[in-house]
From Swiss-Prot:
Domain named TGS: residues: 304-387
Position of the signal peptide: none
Domain OBG-type G: 23-283
SUPFAM superfamilies (alphabetical): P-loop containing nucleoside triphosphate hydrolases, TGS-like
CDD domains membership: TGS_YchF_OLA1, YchF
Recorded GO CC terms: cytoplasm; nucleolus
Organism phylogeny: Eukaryota, Metazoa, Chordata, Craniata, Vertebrata
Protein name, entry field: Obg-like ATPase 1
Family named by the database record: Belongs to the TRAFAC class OBG-HflX-like GTPase superfamily. OBG GTPase family. YchF/OLA1 subfamily.
InterPro entries: ATPase_YchF/OLA1, Beta-grasp_dom_sf, G_OBG, GTP-bd, P-loop_NTPase, TGS, TGS-like, TGS-like_dom_sf
Principal cellular location given in the protein's record: cytoplasm
Entry binding sites for Mg(2+): 36, 56
Glycoprotein found in the keyword field: no
Described function: Hydrolyzes ATP, and can also hydrolyze GTP with lower efficiency. Has lower affinity for GTP.
Length: 396
């Protein structure tokens, strides 16, 4: 069957942010809200989780494997010599405080660490504990969210002024017509962030040209954000906390579409130390379960990443690509020669492979398809690439 021709497929929405696959998500919040405890559980590492502000000064970074039943199934089926899952790069960033944009606390260093990330786990505290001081004196997660939001917005406001001044000098007073569109776009960004006091990502109607300009500057408020609400173990198990509704209302009003995920660092830490039998018994008795898998997958998705599989007896591997990646560029993740000499991608959907029971059965059922260079790779595709080897240099 020849590769399908067709068009370029559905138009993908433009993506705000760094282009690439080695992207990071940072854990951000006020001091003593549970960031390092969460990071420790997430990465099974032992970053210092001390009860005082700024105990995490150098960001701790870790690669967290993405839990995936499809990957596990392929490994069980092929029993490969090598297994390589996809990973989420997570950074534990020290607590921000009010005034961080102006250098309060260790503000400038922490904000630069957030600049280096591509999405944010925004952690807020909704548990009371006399032994764990709160930097603001009392627990109020909505206030805490607003503090972090305002610090990020104020830092962007500081950046926007000089950018517009420079563009005004060259595009308006200097008459450089090529830069005039960028100047106009930055004025729109200024109106939104400085005058309306909103985050870049709140506005969902940025067009391609505007996103091109936003991606030159990578503003803090353009980064996707997932809200993690840290509860006590008791509240997490009973699925009740007086702050949850208020937090959801705030997020729906200010950051519509953003995820709010309740968790309990205390529960997850305890759960991680249990044996499999103890975990099962505890979860059945308390009608609860770990939320880590959902958080990890949500973080990966927030970075606009997905992965395809190559699978066989030598290796089962998940290859990370940006959403909307076409087959030749996906092939290039394996080796540049695969992209240069791309002929076609032979693609099976994981569900078809599992349902039919083997590659040959999937072929016989017409579910093993040959796709051309316009094919947009989908999450969980199992792909075999065909390519021409580039000509070797001729010997003299």
């Amino acid at each position: 069957m020849p590769p399908k021709k067709g068009g370029d497929g559905p138009k993908q929405p433009p993506l705000i942010g760094r282009f690439g696959t080695s992207l990071k998500i940072g854990i951000v919040g006020l001091p003593n809200v549970g960031k390092s405890t969460f990071f420790n559980v997430l990465t099974k590492s032992q970053a210092a989780a001390e009860n005082f502000p700024f105990c995490t000064i150098d960001p701790n970074e870790s690669r967290v494997p993405i839990p995936d039943e499809r990957f596990d199934f392929l490994c069980q089926y092929h029993k490969p010599a090598s297994k390589v899952p996809a990973f989420l790069n997570v950074v534990d960033i020290a607590g921000l405080v009010k005034g961080a944009h102006a250098g309060q606390g260790l503000g400038n260093a922490f904000l630069s660490n957030i600049f280096a990330c591509d999405a944010i786990f925004h952690m807020t505290r909704a548990f009371e504990d006399e032994d764990i001081i709160h930097v603001e004196g009392c627990v109020d997660p909505v206030r805490d969210i607003e503090i972090i939001h305002e610090e990020l917005r104020m830092k962007d406001e500081e950046m926007i002024g000089p950018i517009i001044d420079k563009l005004e000098k060259t595009a308006v007073r200097g008459g450089d017509k090529k830069l005039k569109p960028e100047y106009d776009i930055m004025c729109k960004v200024k109106s939104w962030v400085v005058d309306e006091k909103k985050h870049v990502r709140y506005y969902h109607e940025w067009n391609d040209k505007e996103i091109e300009v936003l991606n030159k500057h990578l503003f803090l408020t353009s980064k996707p954000m997932i809200y993690l609400v840290n509860l006590s173990e008791k509240d997490y198990i009973r699925k009740k906390n007086k702050w949850l509704v208020k937090i959801k209302e705030w997020v729906d009003a200010h950051d519509p579409g953003a995820l709010v995920i309740p968790l309990s660092g205390g529960f997850e830490s305890k759960y991680q130390d249990m044996s499999d039998e103890e975990k099962q018994k505890y979860c059945e008795e308390n009608k609860t379960q770990s939320i880590l898998t959902k958080i990890i997958k949500s973080g990966y998705s927030a970075l606009q990443l997905e992965y395809f599989f190559t699978a066989g007896p030598d290796e089962v591997r998940a290859w990370t690509v940006r959403k909307g990646t076409k087959a030749p560029q996906a092939a290039g993740k394996i080796h540049t020669d695969f992209e240069k000499g791309f002929i076609m991608a032979e693609v099976m959907k994981f569900t078809d492979f599992k349902e039919e029971g083997s590659e040959n059965a999937a072929k016989a059922a017409g579910k093993y398809r040959q796709q051309g260079r316009n094919y947009i790779v989908e999450d969980g595709d199992i792909i075999f690439f065909k390519f021409n080897t580039p000509n070797q240099p001729k010997k003299k």
